[in-house]
Design a protein with these regions (language model features):
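Acidic, proline/glycine-enriched N-terminal capping motif
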Residues: 1-123
Length: 123
C-alpha cells in the first residue's frame, strides 16, 4: 500500500561526488548540493510531510526523469534523496531495518523538466 508520493523537480546531485575538502581535512558537501537540499526540503514541506517520521519497514521507489543522455550515478542520487528524506523527517532513518527495498527506474523524457518521483509504500 502506498503511504506517500513526492515529486522533486530538477536533477538530483550526488552528495558523495560533490564534496569540498577543507584545510582542516574535513570534507563538506558542495554549495550546489547544499542549495539543492534546502530547496528540495521546501518542496517536500509544500507537498506535505507525514508526522511522525515513518519507522516501519518500507519500500521506496525512485523514478528519475532525465532530459538528456548524460551519464549519472543513480546510486549516489538515491543516497542524496534518502539523506533528504531522513533530514526532512519523512523517514526516521535510512538503515536496512526501515528501508527494506529500494528500486530505481531512469527514463529519458522530452516532454517535461528533469525530476524524480519518490513513492514510499509498506514493505
Amino acid at each position: 500500500m502506498i503511504i506517500s508520493n513526492y515529486v522533486l523537480t530538477g536533477e538530483t546531485p550526488s552528495k558523495k561526488n560533490s564534496r569540498i575538502g577543507l584545510r582542516s581535512g574535513k570534507n563538506i558537501p558542495s554549495e550546489r548540493y547544499q542549495k539543492w537540499k534546502k530547496a528540495k526540503h521546501i518542496e517536500l514541506l509544500h507537498q506535505g510531510i507525514l508526522c511522525p517520521p515513518l519507522e516501519k519497514p518500507l519500500t521506496i521507489e525512485f523514478y528519475f526523469y532525465h532530459t538528456d543522455n548524460r551519464t549519472r550515478d543513480t546510486d549516489n542520487q538515491i543516497s542524496s534523496i534518502l539523506d533528504l528524506l531522513k533530514d526532512a523527517k519523512v523517514i526516521k532513518d535510512d538503515n536496512w531495518q526501515i528501508v527494506r527495498r529500494i528500486s530505481a527506474v531512469a527514463l529519458l523524457t522530452k516532454s517535461k523538466e528533469p525530476s524524480v518521483n519518490v513513492v514510499i509504500s509498506e514493505y
